[in-house]
């Protein structure tokens, strides 16, 4: 058990039959009445975000999340196969379970698979990935360097906005948290 007074961003807790990650919190001490903690929580199973208020000093159960380094192997129909780097055990996760992560997953990529009481609840990607551009309009000579962009499709099928100088075959460094272009690889 952990006191809500000890909340930190990124802490995982078990409340209301769900596993939640603390995204944001604020200790509030009104002039009248007792203090409380206002928090913003993300459900690790569904991805839903909820705001919840706790009384100051209230105790909640801390959820112990196990992180295992795994390697993404391949897609098998709608399922995706990962291999544990230590035990070489393989697990399959359905495609709808991965959501946005599919935009960045490529064969042999190392990821962190998160589980709670042996139930897989998420896949954490590296902060950046390098993906090759498979389709984009050619840059025209004389294009300005004033931040103009065009769309490009990378090897996973994900489409993003890139600067005009990016060409097919270029390798891009992409931020996995928001899907934005960082640089050429």
Swiss-Prot record:
One of its GO terms (biological process) is peptide biosynthetic process. GO terms for cellular component: cytoplasm. InterPro entries: Elong-fact-P_C (IPR015365), NA-bd_OB-fold (IPR012340), Rib_uL2_dom2 (IPR014722), Transl_elong_fac_P/YeiP (IPR020599), Transl_elong_KOW-like (IPR013185), Transl_elong_P/YeiP_cen (IPR001059), Transl_elong_P/YeiP_CS (IPR013852), Transl_elongation_fac_P (IPR011768). Pfam families: EFP (PF01132), EFP_N (PF08207), Elong-fact-P_C (PF09285). GO terms for molecular function: translation elongation factor activity. It comes from the Bacteria. SUPFAM superfamilies: Nucleic acid-binding proteins, Translation proteins SH3-like domain. Pathway: Protein biosynthesis; polypeptide chain elongation. It is found in: Cytoplasm. Its main location: cytoplasm. Keywords: Cytoplasm, Elongation factor, Protein biosynthesis. Involved in peptide bond synthesis. Stimulates efficient translation and peptide-bond synthesis on native or reconstituted 70S ribosomes in vitro. Probably functions indirectly by altering the affinity of the ribosome for aminoacyl-tRNA, thus increasing their reactivity as acceptors for peptidyl transferase. Belongs to the elongation factor P family. HAMAP family: EF_P. This is Elongation factor P. It comes from Staphylococcus epidermidis (strain ATCC 35984 / DSM 28319 / BCRC 17069 / CCUG 31568 / BM 3577 / RP62A).
């Amino acid at each position: 058990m952990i006191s809500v007074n000890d909340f930190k961003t990124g802490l995982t807790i078990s409340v209301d039959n769900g596993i939640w990650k603390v995204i944001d919190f604020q200790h509030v001490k009104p002039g009248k009445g007792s203090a409380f903690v206002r928090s913003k929580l993300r459900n690790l199973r569904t991805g839903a975000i909820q705001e919840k208020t706790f009384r100051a000093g209230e105790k909640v159960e801390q959820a112990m999340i196990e992180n295992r380094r795994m390697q993404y192997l391949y897609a098998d129909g709608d399922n995706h196969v990962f291999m544990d780097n230590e035990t070489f055990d393989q697990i399959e996760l359905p495609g709808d379970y991965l959501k946005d992560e599919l935009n960045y997953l490529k064969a042999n990529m190392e990821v962190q698979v998160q589980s709670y009481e042996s139930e897989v609840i998420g896949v954490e990607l590296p902060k950046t990935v390098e993906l090759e551009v498979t389709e984009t309009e050619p840059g025209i000579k004389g294009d300005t360097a004033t931040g103009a962009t065009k769309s490009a499709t990378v090897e996973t099928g994900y489409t993003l906005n890139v600067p005009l100088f990016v060409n097919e075959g270029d390798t891009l460094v992409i931020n996995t948290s928001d899907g934005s272009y960082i640089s050429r690889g």
